[in-house]
Amino acid sequence: MSRFETQFATLNAKNEGAFVPFVTLCDPTFDCSFEIICTLVDNGADALELGFPFSDPLLDGPVIQAANNRALTAGHSSEDSFKLLEKVRSKYPEIPISLLLCANLIFAKGLDAFYQRCAEVGVDAVLVADIPLLAKEDYVQAAKKHGIQPVFICPPNADEKTIQGVAKNSEGYTYLVSRAGVTSAENQAHAANLDTLVEQLKAHYAPPILQGFGIAQPAQVKEALALGAAGAISGSATVKIIERNLDNHEQCLAELAEFVQTMKAATK
């Protein structure tokens, strides 16, 4: 069983949902980022979704774009991100780790080389945000060749064919987007048809569903679980804590610890 499958089975047995924070690797620096990620795991994160710093992220709202810029300004490359992942994996052998990336970033390194490096540093799954199902083949092949689980996004306006494709091709988990638009902690609305989408994904035997976009409050975690999702992903709200404490690292870690504990408590 993969780390994601093992974790979901463990959570199911305890009747808990998953809380998964997202942060950008090397934000604001390599060392601070390592301590941030350790804080997330030590305070109850069930899995990690991590981004590589990139100058042109399509789905990211201003908060995560700023995180990308901080890491890039600090001079961090994709190889630094891989080294950081390696450090995280050696400290936490069990935690499921997924990457959320743009295709250009993978392309720059070459598909095969990128997924091989992911395997070497202990990444479990990769979600390429801007690859439609129709263009998935090369990415899925490269991922599977190196034992990496490909993850796909189910958008709120998905038709039956898309739902079926996402369910069939996703491994590890399924990313259900709460609403159209870019990521944001401010816009906490979600599409009215999410419960139907969850039902349809499950009818097609999709892997466990994690709902993301606009998850900033414990009540929204509860809501995602009530809709039938296996858990919730929180990116902008997590990164915002880093952004507002750039000049006080200890305060940043303390606030992140409290945030993760509160969000995790909502899954029980």
Swiss-Prot record:
Q: Which InterPro entries match?
A: Aldolase_TIM, RibuloseP-bd_barrel, Trp_synthase_alpha_AS, Trp_synthase_suA
> Which GO MF terms does the UniProt record name?
tryptophan synthase activity
Catalysed transformations (reactions): (1S,2R)-1-C-(indol-3-yl)glycerol 3-phosphate + L-serine = D-glyceraldehyde 3-phosphate + L-tryptophan + H2O
Pathway field of the UniProt record reads: Amino-acid biosynthesis; L-tryptophan biosynthesis; L-tryptophan from chorismate: step 5/5
Name a single GO cellular component.
cytosol
Catalytic activity, EC = 4.2.1.20
CDD domains recorded? Tryptophan_synthase_alpha
Q: One Pfam match, by short name? A: Trp_syntA
Q: Which domain of life is it from?
A: Bacteria
Instruction: Locate the active site.
Output: 49 (proton acceptor), 60 (proton acceptor)
Q: Which UniProt keywords apply?
A: Amino-acid biosynthesis, Aromatic amino acid biosynthesis, Lyase, Tryptophan biosynthesis
Q: What does this protein do?
A: The alpha subunit is responsible for the aldol cleavage of indoleglycerol phosphate to indole and glyceraldehyde 3-phosphate.
Q: Which family does it belong to?
A: Belongs to the TrpA family.
- PANTHER family found in the cross-reference section: TRYPTOPHAN SYNTHASE ALPHA CHAIN, CHLOROPLASTIC, TRYPTOPHAN SYNTHASE, ALPHA CHAIN
Q: How does it assemble?
A: Tetramer of two alpha and two beta chains.
Protein name per Swiss-Prot or TrEMBL: Tryptophan synthase alpha chain
Lineage, top ranks = Bacteria, Pseudomonadati, Pseudomonadota, Gammaproteobacteria, Pasteurellales
